[in-house]
Amino acid sequence: MFRTMMKSKIHRATVTHADLHYVGSVTVDQDLMDAADLLEGEQVCIVDIDNGARLETYVIAGERGSGVIGINGAAAHLVKPGDLVILIAYGVMNEQEVRDYEPRVVFVDAANSPIELGADPAHAPEGSGLITPRMLSTLDAERESSLV
């Protein structure tokens, strides 16, 4: 059996521009592509944290070190400059590959420079203010004890 698994993601990147009159795709800084193991032409899902939009497109390499995350074509109706997005690539793997594979998770700063690399898809960097599902039972217990 084959399974579709998260291969890599760039988490909370800031959209630098959106161009409606482009042929499509998302332009991504080549440094981020390398960190996330993305290839030009590879399919990605873009999740807009600000408005909840989800869309699929493909990656085009942007200038290395530029921090570019450019939304191109019709997707510019859904995702605007300044929006925070998650870019997710999936891979189809057999059972053995699933057990051996470690995804690439790239957290970026406000300038879209990588600040943390990892393999845990549910990890939240310390000090980020993000909540990981692995913390929910602890948070629920803290909330309950504060109500008593």
UniProtKB/Swiss-Prot annotation:
Positions carrying Pyruvic acid (Ser) are: 25
Per the record, what are the reactions this protein catalyses?
Answer: L-aspartate + H(+) = beta-alanine + CO2
Q: Which GO terms describe its cellular component?
A: cytosol
This enzyme's EC code(s): 4.1.1.11
Concerning PTM, the database record says: Is synthesized initially as an inactive proenzyme, which is activated by self-cleavage at a specific serine bond to produce a beta-subunit with a hydroxyl group at its C-terminus and an alpha-subunit with a pyruvoyl group at its N-terminus.
Compartment annotation: Cytoplasm
Active site (UniProt): 25 (schiff-base intermediate with substrate), 58 (proton donor)
Record flagged with keyword Lyase: yes
Query: For substrate, which residues are the binding ones?
Result: 57, 73-75
Instruction: Give an example GO molecular function.
Output: aspartate 1-decarboxylase activity
The free-text note explaining how the cofactor binds reads: Binds 1 pyruvoyl group covalently per subunit.
Domain of life where this protein originates: Bacteria
> What is stated as this protein's family in its record?
Belongs to the PanD family.
Role: Catalyzes the pyruvoyl-dependent decarboxylation of aspartate to produce beta-alanine.
| Stated name of the protein | Aspartate 1-decarboxylase
Species in which this protein is naturally found: Rhodococcus jostii (strain RHA1)
